[in-house]
Structures are given as structure tokens and as C-alpha cells.
Swiss-Prot record:
Coiled coil: none annotated. It comes from the Bacteria. It comes from Mycobacterium marinum (strain ATCC BAA-535 / M). GO terms for molecular function: structural constituent of ribosome. The lineage of its organism: Bacteria, Bacillati, Actinomycetota, Actinomycetes, Mycobacteriales. Gene3D superfamilies: Ribosomal protein L33. This is Large ribosomal subunit protein bL33B. InterPro entries: Ribosomal_bL33, Ribosomal_bL33_CS, Ribosomal_bL33_sf, Ribosomal_zn-bd. GO terms for cellular component: cytoplasm; ribonucleoprotein complex; ribosome. The keyword Ribosomal protein applies. HAMAP family: Ribosomal_bL33 (MF_00294). Belongs to the bacterial ribosomal protein bL33 family. The keyword Ribonucleoprotein applies.
């Protein structure tokens, strides 16, 4: 089972516009301590939008 101090935890990315949680990925907590933000395709909006890490 993954611990809460895992170096590469699973994170969920949610669309900034429609707030749908579209992607699940992993990130390295040591290299990226802040919230991750990527431009990804949102199927709900039908265009590329900023997706931000949710907690």
C-alpha cells in the first residue's frame, strides 16, 4: 500500500474551466513540490485547457 510520504504519488488533474477530473498521473514530489499545471485536452470542453492538480 502506498504511504502518504510516497516520493511519486498518484495525482488527479482537473480542468480549470469545467472542473472535470480527466487525467490521473504521477509526479515526483521532490522535483515539483508545488501543484502541477499542464495544458491537456479536455473531452468535456472539446479543446486544450489548463489542467491543475487536485487534492
Amino acid at each position: 500500500m502506498a504511504s502518504s510520504t510516497d516520493v511519486r504519488p498518484k495525482i488527479t488533474l482537473a480542468c480549470e474551466v469545467c472542473k472535470h477530473r480527466n487525467y490521473i498521473t504521477k509526479k515526483n514530489r521532490r522535483n515539483d513540490p508545488d501543484r502541477l499545471e499542464l495544458k491537456k485536452f479536455c473531452r468535456n470542453c472539446g479543446s486544450h485547457q489548463a489542467h491543475r492538480e487536485t487534492r
